[in-house]
Each structure stands twice: as structure tokens, then as C-alpha cells.
């Protein structure tokens, strides 16, 4: 064995999906005449190399020739020199080390020679070199790198560089997390163990052992709050809590019964209970010029926009100035008047908006929506059914009133009422995997007489209810629909949501989607590629898988025939996969900006939505500027997508800069009904819940991703890929699916009886302290406030008093505080 080299030699940091090498011993092309372009190109290529690089290249080529020398002594020297060059090559993380670059053309030659070598130490040395070269050369799926590693010499593989070591094993992250889980359990840090269990949920880790490992009832209540925030619905059985009162208390917390109460406590503390009207949001008096005198253009559409703005702004407050007024005791009150200022399907959205205003308060909500269920107007009934779903979103109840009320209306013949009922069920039971819902909705999918729109909404609702479950029966039903429909039907804009419904079943489940993806290759060519890309991007959502991002970027770089639409979902897929961590997200933003410059039109239309998803409820200045530029784009679809995305990145932040941009856009587009509608929706989103809500699917210090919240966002974004036909058409009520992602961005500290407890906390920018020894500062640039407080994107809170101890390490949402027995007041 030759002496070991510097163990930090970074031997390779190339992507494994680089082009496949040329076949072994490919004949060199003959030089062309001097006049030909080829010669000049070759000369130019060599001119680009510095003298040092040129010398290295020639040296390596000499080693390749000598490595095939019949004399073992010469061979050994050449191989050792080559090993040394590769191992001592240092490079940045993003580029291929030079020795690998220069050896690339000779990979085939060395591979072919390796097969002819007799068994010896020299053959092992050659295998080591080929193993490292295979990182950048071998075809995907061949696993040549591992193959040559096994044949090669035993020993310290770390000396070839950490990228090489990282690339060799299959993903070990799951086993590492399981070990972390076991360590947390062993040392009694159950709250952190629960966070890991939620991350690996459905992948073999159960939640019950965490509850049974402790007898501390207060701690169990804190676990219940964490699970409720994640959106999981689990049953509390006798093993978790033997006492009936304790069992009921835990079930109430997991069912989110306390959410509305906590949210309103925050609102009262911040003094934002006063209802706001759409006019308060538009702030027309601040606009100078033409948009100030509100145009009477398409007043029904303006009323519809006002309905959405009103619903978004007053979400969860239980009162507003349009739908819930004191004279509301009779249906002839002003809420009735506003309802009938909308036309046809606009009335459905208006009635459903009441559900959003009363969000999470199911008792009061169901009582107020009940009167609309008995209306003679089918659109009002449909809206009421959707409203029942919205008000019950994330809130479970023993008697299941939402299912009882909604399922009564399935027998109605009117298409709009059925859609209201179907979407209502999807929103109310998202993530619950409730069997009764499956039976009801599958009946629509298997009925060949049902209109297309009912098929699509049934599939979407099934996708939401069974999100991430990999449920074979539901998948099979949706696949049958996709196979049986004719080409003209598949060309309908709304049909693009069927592959999304199928993808939701595999959200974040990675390889589990492969069997279904194979089946999708047999679909009609109209929808085949769209389905394939959508399935892949949803299955790898939130994983940060670089290879899949590369594949999607490859799809975006193709030049398509007219009529192909699958590049839109590919662009969304890039942000879906890359949103997992900060660095990946920043790199994706850069890639998306390149696509804006060089991409085809259908790619440019999706880029604003992808950026909106990457920075949701997190208004970054560079993304904001890009959106501002695109909102004036010559292509109407691009500018509308950019306007909606301005709303998404500012969702629930009350960001003054975005609010100003949107006001200017409302005057710029005052004659364009479609654009103005988008501006209004964006204004409503920016002031979501008067600035108390977020749409971000990440929580618990960006460690956990709520699949239900992500499912809601993905569905709406795919609908926005065809803004004119879906959101600006008659399916505007799809915007209510965003309810699934709405969560208060609060820190509410409570005592052991769950009564609000005001304590001082420091709130500042989170600092990444992973791997640092001791107790480093976890936040920077903090301010001290008294709870309850709001947490913006990227902020973290810590207690500023030692009087209490929190029962969870991550201060977000509901946090139970316990008195510190060792604390003595001076």
C-alpha cells in the first residue's frame, strides 16, 4: 500500500447525473482541414487552459498510457501518481476537481483495460481510481462507483474526500434519525423525540410509546399541542391516558378545540379585534390618479373580489362588516344583502366566506351557516356546504356534525351543490383518512354519467383526505378515471387537477410512487407527461433531493411542441423539492431566475408561482423585486401569476412594501377586470387574519413540514397555472383550499390549567447552532416582549425569565409553562 495522503483531500464533488462517458477506446476524430470550424474550436479549447492546467492534463494523459504498460513497475508508479493527483485535488463544493475533468475522456479506456488485468494489488489500485471517476461518469442506476469500491483495496475511504464518502452509501438519514430518537427517549427528552417521530411518521415510528414513556400529564398535553399543530388526527386510548377526564382533555387539544380561543386571546392582546372592511385594505385614498375613482367595470367581479378579501382579512375572528352583522338574526339582514350582490357561483363563494370568518369555531359557525342550507338558491346552498367544511378545517368533533350535514346533500342533482359538498368534505377531513368519506367520494369517480368537474373535485378531495397515505384503492380509482376519459375531455383545463389528486396520495413519500408512475406512462399522451412530472414533484416534495431538481431543470430546458403543458408542473416541482432547507431554496431562486430569462412562455408563467411557494409568508426583498418586475409583464398570465405570488410571499405579514406595490398595481390595471381581481386577492392574502396568520407549511423551527398545509398550497398553485380558466372562471372557490395552510403565527404561553400566562420572551432572528459546543446564542438582534407574541418567518423565541420552565424546547404555538422549583425571587 502506498503511504496515505492528506485525509482532507476533497476528491470529488461532482453530480452523479453528469453525462454518460464515451464507450471504451473510441477512435479519435481525424483532424479537419484548417479552414474547418472543428480545428479552431479545439485550438480555442486548449488555449483556454492555463499553463499549469495544460501541464496537469498532459501529465495525466501520460499516466493513463503508462498505467497500461506491460511492466508492473511502470504501471504501479503511474497508478500511484494518478491516485495522488486525484486525492490531493482540492475543489469547491460545486465544481469537478481538475484531475477528474481531464481523466473523463479516458474513463472508457481505463475501464476496458481493467477488465483485462490479472488479479493483483495493481488491479485493486486501478479499481480505487475507477470508483472515484465513476462518481461523475457512470450512468444513473449502474452504481459502478460502489462496484469498483468493493473490488478495490480495503482501507480508509475518507481519504478520497467527503463528497465521495457521502455518495457511496444509500440514504442513511432515516437510520440516523432513528438513533437520535432512541437517544432522546433514553435520556427523557420526550418533546424532541416527538418531533423526530412526527418527521418519520408512517415510516415505522409510532407516537404512542412517547406518551406511555411518561406519567407527567402536563407533558402529555404539550405533546398533544405539537401533534395538533402538525395536523395529525390520532385517537387517545387507555394506554395513553387511563383517566377519563385526562383522556377527554388530551382529545380536545388534539382536535384543536382550543385553537379558536387561543387565536382570539392573541387578537385581543394585540388589539386587532375590530372587523375590517375591504375598503380598509384597498386604501383607495392613498392612490393618486385613475384607479382612485373606483371603476364600475364588472361590478359583480369586484364584489366577488371583496368577498374573498373580507374572508381572508377577518379569517377566524368571528365578525366582519359584510357577512356577520348584529342585525343578522333574520336572513333579511345585511349579510343577506351582501350575499345577493354576487351573481350565481359568486353567491357560493360569498356564503362559504362565512365559514372562513368563523374559522375553527365550529359550534358558532355551523349555527350561522345552517340558515343558508335551507335557501332556495342552489348556489347559496353549495356555498353553505363548502363553508361547513371550511369552519371545521382542522377541528375534529366527537359527533362529527360536518359529515352528517354535508353527506345529506350528496343525493341532490344540481352539480354546484355536489361540488360544494365534495370540496367541503375534502377541506374538513383533510389528512384524516376517513373511510366513510372515501366511500362517498369514490361513488362519484366510478359513475360514468357524472360531469367532469364533479369527477375532478371528488379526486382532489380524496387526495386531500388521504394525503401521503399511498392508499392503493384511491389511487386505482383515480387512475381508472384518467385511463377511461377521451382525448377532448382530457384537454379540458380543469382536468390538470386529476394528476395532482393522484400525486397528493404520495406527497413526500419518495420511492413509493414508482409503481403508479410506471402506470402513468400508459395514459393518453395528452396527459402522460403532465402526470409523470406532477407525480415525481409531489412524491419528493420537501425532501431537497438534488437529483430530482436536476431532472426537472432538464425538463424545463427542452424545446416542446405546441400544446404540451408539463413544464409548468416541472417548475413548481423545483420549488416543492427545494423548499426543504435554506441553501437549497436560495439555489432554486437563482435557477428560477435563469428560467425567466431563457425559458419558453409556459415556463415563465409558472416561475412566479414557484417563487411564491419557495418564499411563502416570507417576503424576501430580491424575490419581491422580481415579482414587482413581472407584475408588469407583457404576457397576461405571467403578470397575473406574479400578482398572486406577491400575495403569497407576503401572506399574513401586513408587509407595507408589498401593500404599496399592490395599491399601485390596482391603479395600473384599473381597466383590466382579471388583473384587478388578482390584485384584490393578493391584497387579501397580505393582510391574512389581519397579520396574525401564516401560510407556511413548516413549523417547529422549520423542522417539520405539515403535509396537509402543503397539499392545500399545491392544489391552489396548480389551479393558478391556468388562471383564466380556473380561478378567473367559475372555480374561484378553489382559493378556499388555502384554509388548510392557515395557522396562527403566534407564541401563546399558558399555565398548567391552560389559562394564558404573560411572561417576558426574547424574539429575534434564529441562528443555526447545530454542532456547536456549549450553549451558544440561538437568536440574534432580539427584542423583549410579553406573550402572546407574533413570530415572523425565520424568528425564534426564548424565555427571558427563569421563573418558568417551558415543556417544549421549541417555543411556538401553545407552550405550557411550569414553575421553576429552583427559582427564588430576590
Please give the residue ranges for each predicted region.
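Residue-level recognition of alpha-helix termini/interfacial anchor residues
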Residues: 102-106, 110-113
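Helix-loop-helix module between adjacent transmembrane segments
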Residues: 426-427
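N-terminal intrinsically disordered, low-complexity tails
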Residues: 17-25
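Long, N-terminal intrinsically disordered regulatory "head" regions
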Residues: 2, 6-10, 14-18
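Long internal repeat-built scaffold domains in very large eukaryotic proteins
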Residues: 3-4, 8, 24, 33-41, ...
Amino acid at each position: 500500500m502506498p503511504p496515505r495522503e492528506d485525509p482532507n483531500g476533497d476528491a470529488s464533488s461532482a453530480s452523479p447525473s453528469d453525462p454518460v462517458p464515451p464507450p471504451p477506446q473510441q477512435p479519435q476524430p481525424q483532424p479537419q482541414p484548417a479552414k474547418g470550424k472543428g480545428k479552431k474550436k479545439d485550438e480555442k479549447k486548449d488555449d483556454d487552459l492555463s499553463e499549469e492546467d495544460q501541464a496537469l492534463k498532459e501529465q495525466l494523459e501520460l499516466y493513463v498510457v503508462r498505467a497500461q504498460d506491460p511492466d508492473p513497475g511502470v504501471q504501479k508508479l503511474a497508478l500511484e501518481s494518478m491516485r495522488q493527483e486525484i486525492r490531493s485535488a482540492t475543489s469547491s463544493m460545486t465544481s469537478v476537481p481538475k484531475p477528474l475533468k481531464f481523466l473523463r475522456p479516458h474513463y472508457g479506456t481505463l475501464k476496458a483495460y481493467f477488465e483485462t488485468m490479472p488479479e493483483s494489488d495493481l488491479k485493486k489500485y486501478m479499481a480505487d481510481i475507477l470508483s472515484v471517476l465513476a462518481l461523475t461518469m457512470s450512468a444513473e442506476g449502474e452504481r459502478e462507483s460502489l462496484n469498483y469500491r468493493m473490488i478495490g483495496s480495503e482501507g480508509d475511504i475518507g481519504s478520497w474526500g467527503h463528497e465521495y464518502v457521502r455518495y457511496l452509501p444509500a440514504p442513511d438519514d432515516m437510520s440516523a434519525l432513528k438513533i437520535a430518537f432512541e437517544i432522546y427517549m433514553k435520556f427523557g427528552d420526550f418533546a424532541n423525540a416527538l418531533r423526530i417521530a412526527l418527521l418519520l411518521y408512517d415510516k415505522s415510528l409510532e407516537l404512542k410509546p412517547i406518551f406511555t414513556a411518561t406519567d407527567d400529564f402536563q407533558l402529555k398535553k404539550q405533546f398533544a399541542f405539537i401533534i395538533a399543530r402538525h395536523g395529525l388526527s390520532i385517537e387517545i386510548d387507555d394506554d395513553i391516558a387511563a383517566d377519563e377526564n385526562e383522556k377527554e382533555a388530551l382529545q380536545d387539544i388534539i382536535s384543536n378545540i382550543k385553537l379558536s380561543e387561543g387565536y382570539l386571546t392573541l387578537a385581543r392582546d394585540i388589539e386587532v379585534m375590530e372587523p375590517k372592511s375591504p375598503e380598509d385594505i384597498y386604501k383607495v385614498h392613498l392612490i393618486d390618479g385613475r384607479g382612485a375613482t373606483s371603476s364600475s367595470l364588472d361590478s359583480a367581479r369586484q364584489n366577488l373580489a371583496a368577498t374573498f378579501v373580507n374572508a381572508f382579512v377577518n379569517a377566524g375572528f368571528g365578525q366582519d362588516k359584510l357577512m356577520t352583522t348584529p342585525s343578522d338574526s333574520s336572513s333579511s339582514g345585511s349579510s343577506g344583502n351582501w350575499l345577493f350582490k354576487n351573481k350565481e357561483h359568486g353567491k357560493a363563494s360569498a356564503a362559504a366566506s362565512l365559514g372562513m370568518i368563523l374559522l375553527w369555531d365550529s359550534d358558532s359557525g355551523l349555527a350561522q351557516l345552517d340558515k343558508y342550507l335551507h335557501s332556495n338558491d342552489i348556489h347559496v346552498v353549495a356555498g353553505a356546504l363548502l363553508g361547513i367544511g371550511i369552519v371545521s378545517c382542522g377541528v375534529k368533533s366527537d359527533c362529527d356534525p360536518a359529515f352528517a350535514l354535508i353527506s345529506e346533500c350528496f343525493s341532490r342533482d344540481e352539480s354546484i351543490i355536489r361540488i360544494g359538498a365534495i370540496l367541503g368534505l375534502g377541506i374538513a377531513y383533510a389528512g384524516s383518512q376517513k373511510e366513510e368519506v372515501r366511500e362517498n367520494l369514490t361513488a362519484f369517480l366510478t359513475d360514468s354519467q357524472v360531469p367532469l368537474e364533479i369527477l375532478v373535485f371528488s379526486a382532489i378531495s380524496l387526495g386531500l383526505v388521504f394525503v401521503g397515505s399511498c392508499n392503493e384503492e384511491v389511487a386505482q380509482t383515480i387512475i381508472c378515471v384518467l385511463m377511461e376519459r377521451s382525448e377532448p375531455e382530457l384537454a379540458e383545463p380543469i382536468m390538470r387537477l386529476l394528476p395532482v389528486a393522484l400525486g397528493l396520495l404520495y406527497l413526500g413519500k419518495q420511492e413509493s410512487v414508482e409503481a403508479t408512475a410506471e402506470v402513468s406512462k400508459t395514459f393518453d399522451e395528452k396527459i402522460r407527461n403532465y402526470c409523470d412530472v406532477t407525480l415525481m414533484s409531489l412524491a419528493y416534495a420537501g425532501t431537497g433531493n438534488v437529483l430530482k431538481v436536476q431532472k426537472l431543470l432538464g425538463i424545463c430546458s427542452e424545446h416542446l411542441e405546441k400544446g404540451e403543458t408539463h413544464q409548468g408542473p416541472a417548475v413548481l416541482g423545483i420549488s416543492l423539492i427545494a423548499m426543504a432547507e435554506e441553501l437549497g431554496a436560495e439555489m432554486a431562486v437563482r435557477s428560477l431566475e435563469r428560467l425567466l430569462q431563457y425559458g419558453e412562455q409556459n415556463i415563465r408563467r409558472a416561475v412566479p408561482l414557484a417563487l411564491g411557494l419557495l418564499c411563502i409568508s416570507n417576503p424576501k426583498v430580491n424575490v419581491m423585486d422580481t415579482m414587482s418586475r413581472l407584475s408588469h409583464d407583457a404576457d397576461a398570465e405571467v403578470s397575473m401569476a406574479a400578482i398572486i405570488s406577491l400575495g403569497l410571499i407576503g401572506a399574513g405579514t401586513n408587509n407595507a412594501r408589498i401593500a404599496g406595490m399592490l395599491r399601485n398595481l390596482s391603479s395600473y390595471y384599473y381597466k383590466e377586470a382579471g388583473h384587478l381581481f388578482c390584485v384584490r386577492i393578493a391584497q387579501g392574502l397580505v393582510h391574512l387574519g389581519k397579520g396574525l396568520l401564516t401560510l407556511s407549511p413548516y413549523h417547529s423551527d422549520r423542522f417539520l413540514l405539515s403535509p396537509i398545509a402543503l397539499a392545500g398550497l399545491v392544489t391552489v398553485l396548480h389551479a393558478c397555472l391556468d388562471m383564466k380558466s380556473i380561478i378567473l372562471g367559475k372555480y374561484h372557490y378553489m382559493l378556499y383550499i388555502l384554509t388548510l395552510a392557515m395557522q396562527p403565527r403566534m407564541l401563546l404561553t399558558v399555565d398548567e390549567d391552560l389559562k394564558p400566562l404573560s411572561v417576558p420572551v426574547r424574539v429575534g432572528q434564529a441562528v443555526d447552532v447545530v454542532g456547536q459546543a456549549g450553549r451558544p446564542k440561538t437568536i440574534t438582534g432580539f427584542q423583549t416582549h410579553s406573550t402572546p407574541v407574533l413570530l415572523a418567518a425565520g424568528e425564534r423565541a426564548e424565555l427571558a425569565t427563569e421563573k418558568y420552565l417551558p415543556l417544549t424546547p421549541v417555543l411556538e404555538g401553545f407552550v405550557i409553562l411550569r414553575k421553576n422549583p429552583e427559582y427564588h425571587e430576590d
